[in-house]
Amino acid sequence: MCGIAGIIHKKAGKGVNIGEQMTSMLQALKHRGPDSTGYAMYGKDNGNQIIRFKVAEAADLEGSYDIHAIIKDRLETVNSRLTELGVKVVKKESPTEYAHRYEVKFSGDMKKVADFVEDVEGVEILSIGNSLELVKDLGDASVVSNQYGLNDFNGTHGIGHTRMATESDVDIRSAHPYWAYPFSDVAVVHNGQLTNYWTNRRALERSGHRFSSNCDSELIAVYLADRMSQGDDLETAMKGSIDYLDGVFTYLVATKDQLGMAK
């Protein structure tokens, strides 16, 4: 049992306080899932790319005496690899010791960047986009929003999720939303249970797709990425998902200028 929410302002102009609105909606859904909360929000595109990534899980901070040194080493390796690929970091923010936001300039293949960075042990890219910012962590919406400073996020639309873990671990990796890697600005949230997860996951992995968790919801994001990589537009891919996915489900998907629902 989880909660999902979405909002879009088609005539937002310079944007509205999407962060505050999403937090209000997700906090109202706290009873549907107290384990973790996630946001996929869309701000103004200034021509740069936003990379949201983590170098550890929140629980890791309590699990190892060496974790702070490990986190430092991982972050230094990420920075080195970005430099090696010619990625110019113009702004860095670290809302937590393990979660980071980089604003970058890069005109090359962002999939190559994502793969090279995620090759670092313990590192996961949560999202890449010109307007998408994906934030998720343990706790309810008020906790996550305050931790990441989301209450004044200005944008046009967003989707979010409150999670009650039933099929996978309680950690950031298993929290929603999921980025539709490697497509910039595409994210998914889901409520329900997919009964053909493992069969379809193995098929997609054989096709070269990667999964970062054991959460069945990630299958939706990977499937949409697969279909769009083969030329489908978002609406066509979503219609195909109705037959492809087995189980009881409802999901929301957002792009830089669209918000859709399938069930």
Question: What residue spans do the PLM features occupy?
Answer:
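Conserved short alpha-helical segments that host acidic/polar catalytic motifs at enzyme active sites
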Residues: 1-263
